[in-house]
Amino acid sequence: LIIKLKGSDREQVNACSDIISKALHRIRVTITHNEDVQAHEAAVANTLALWADSDEVDFIITSGGTGLGPDDVTPDATRSVIDREVPGLAEIMRLDGFKKHHSAILSRAVVGIRGRCMIFNLPGNPGAVEEYMELLLPIIPHAVDEVQSA
């Protein structure tokens, strides 16, 4: 799920989507949905809830809208639909990112669970998305298994 901010660079949006897709294919994940959503909290929340409540989605990765700007509503939308947060994953993403780029600490990204679906917020910067996907790839299968078996 790509969150499109006002004035988003189409190339950057496409690059983030491609990086996520390629990384997930490496761990043999089938992508069932891929959509751009405008940066409106209700639109993002509705899409997250719809996908998370479907039987065909085990986890959702968002890209974009995690910063401090007025259009950065992804964490707020995510918090409004999740049942529980998984703060350690968001914390490790910020910490890992901070080691390379101090501005990563400003991310408001959230990781949480709705029903039997995990939701991961990633930034909208292709370089950061690539770094965070490398960090998350070994964790996603185990985390999803834990949520699915609950």
Regions found by a protein language model. Give the residues of each.
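Non-catalytic beta/alpha edge segments that cap or flank active sites
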Residues: 1-150
